[in-house]
């Protein structure tokens, strides 16, 4: 039985990844900051199949606890997903975000290096980053390949870029088998409504309940690249198996869609008679107007390809919330 360690297994993507690994017969150890997640994405049987390590990975400043975790899990593959993922929250507390999004990853990689020297542990490691690392580029530059210069405009993007820099430096300097991602927008059942697409779905569901004719929305011209969470999980598994160590990969659909188009599709799929109206309070002045990725490298190196559409994302999320 193959063994995997997932940091942030209690998160949105972490639960879907754990679910998939359990179904494939992996022995899964998952870290959870706020406790074992409620039954939902994971069934009760899937929950029980996972060895949970509950606690705050930022609490310890030495490598002891992280090395002990690696000793218990003895992973062949590590998926480092733990971190702060909501851009405004990171902006409000960048010091904590730096420790969470960068410090934890550094300690994890240093612990792997120490365990390799001590007992020969040599796992494949996936470090998950963000398309926010790219920052702002002109519309005609889309879709962005991995060779595009990274110039993040948010503290969140900056922490993820720092995480990638340290991870790839560890791969070059110490030969750790690390692959990093620049993951674009992804969604699906279980995604929190603080993020755009699930927030739109939640507002339309509320309009169906109340009979509201209009709903608030931010900038409808912003263009983003969406993947179904199940395609994201497939990409992460493909990269653990076939990604090239020391390299970064876009995880994306390669297609851009405006927020207005997403909102219109949510309404169309719901069948609710409602329309969105722009609310100035929801506008983010620092937003990157267009962010679309080129997935050629991921597809070529691993054979991965997206299988789910934006309509699938909306339908799955809508029905899961019913």
Residues of each region from the PLM?
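Catalytic helix-loop patch of NAD(P)-dependent Rossmann-fold dehydrogenases
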Residues: 92-110, 121-124, 132-180
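Conserved glycine-rich Rossmann-like NAD(P)H-binding loop of the short-chain dehydrogenase/reductase
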Residues: 26-37
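NAD(P)-dependent short-chain dehydrogenase/reductase
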Residues: 137-142, 165-225, 229-238, 256, ...
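C-terminal "lid/loop" region of Rossmann-like NAD(P)-dependent oxidoreductases
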Residues: 214-215, 219, 248-249, 257-264, ...
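Amphipathic terminal alpha-helices
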Residues: 2-3, 310-322
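Rossmann-fold cofactor-recognition segment
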Residues: 46-61
